[in-house]
C-alpha cells in the first residue's frame, strides 16, 4: 500500500476578480472555488486518478477539518487522519486578479501526543509499503520531524519518498530514502552551491 502524509492540509478558497485588487476597498468576485489539498493529499488524488489506491494520513481539526475529510471521501480517497482536539484545518485564500495574492493560514498546533498517534499508524508498515512525506509542516512541529519518522522506520524495508525543502529534506538523507524530489534551487541548498547548467545539476544529483 502507498501511504501519503500531509502535516498541514488546507482548504484553498480561490477567488477570481475581473479587475485589479483594491486594498482597503470592497472587491466583487466574478467566480470562486474551493480546492482541498496539501502536497500529500494531492499525491493521493493523482494516484486515485491513475487507479492506484493509497491512504492519506495527516492531521485535521475543527469543522474545516471535517469538511475536508468529507470532501476527500466524496472524491474516492481513503483517509486515516489524526483528529486534533483544538484549532482548525487551515484555509488559504487565493485571490486571482491582475496579480495573484495569497493569504495562507497557519494551521493548528500539533501536540506531541497527536504526533505519537501518527507514528503508531506507521508502525504497521512493511517492505511491501511506500511512504510519501510531502510538503511543509506547521510551526508547532520540530524541523526534524521527517527525520524522526524515517528513523522509526529504518531497517523495515519501507520505501520512503520525500518531497520537502531545506532541513526537512537534508535531515533525512542519512536514512537513504528511496526517492527525493528537490528542484534545482533545493538541490543547490543540499550540495552548498548554486546550480546553473544541466551538467552542474546532473553532477550534484
What are the residue ranges of the model-derived segments?
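Glycine-rich phosphate/adenosyl-contacting loop at the front of the ribokinase-like
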Residues: 1-57, 65-67
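General beta-strand structural signal in soluble alpha/beta enzymes
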Residues: 5, 81, 132-133, 160-164, ...
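Cofactor-binding loop segments of dinucleotide-utilizing enzymes, especially the Rossmann-like FAD-
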Residues: 5-9, 59-62, 84, 136, ...
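Short glycine-rich anion-binding loops that position phosphate/pyrophosphate groups of nucleotides
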Residues: 8-10, 98-100, 106-108, 136-139, ...
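Conserved phosphate/ATP/ADP-binding segment of small-molecule kinases
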Residues: 143-205
Amino acid at each position: 500500500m502507498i501511504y501519503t502524509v500531509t502535516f498541514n492540509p488546507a482548504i484553498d478558497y480561490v477567488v477570481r476578480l475581473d479587475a485589479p485588487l483594491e486594498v482597503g476597498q470592497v472587491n466583487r468576485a466574478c467566480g470562486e472555488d474551493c480546492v482541498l489539498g496539501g502536497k500529500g493529499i494531492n499525491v493521493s488524488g493523482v494516484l486515485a486518478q491513475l487507479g492506484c489506491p493509497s491512504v492519506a494520513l495527516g492531521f485535521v481539526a475543527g469543522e474545516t477539518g471535517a469538511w475536508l475529510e468529507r470532501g476527500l471521501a466524496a472524491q474516492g480517497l481513503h483517509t486515516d487522519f489524526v483528529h486534533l482536539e483544538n484549532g482548525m484545518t487551515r484555509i488559504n485564500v487565493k485571490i486571482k486578479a491582475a496579480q495573484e495574492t495569497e493569504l495562507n493560514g497557519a494551521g493548528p498546533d500539533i501536540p506531541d501526543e497527536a504526533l505519537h498517534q501518527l507514528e503508531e499508524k506507521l508502525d504497521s508498515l512493511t517492505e511491501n509499503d511506500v511512504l510519501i512525506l510531502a510538503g511543509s509542516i506547521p510551526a508547532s512541529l520540530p524541523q526534524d520531524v521527517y527525520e524522526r519518522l524515517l528513523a522509526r522506520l529504518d531497517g523495515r524495508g519501507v520505501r520512503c519518498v520525500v518531497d520537502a525543502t531545506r532541513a526537512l529534506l537534508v535531515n533525512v538523507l542519512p536514512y537513504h530514502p528511496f526517492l527525493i524530489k528537490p528542484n534545482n534551487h533545493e538541490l543547490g541548498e543540499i550540495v552548498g552551491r548554486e546550480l546553473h547548467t544541466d551538467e552542474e545539476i546532473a553532477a550534484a544529483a
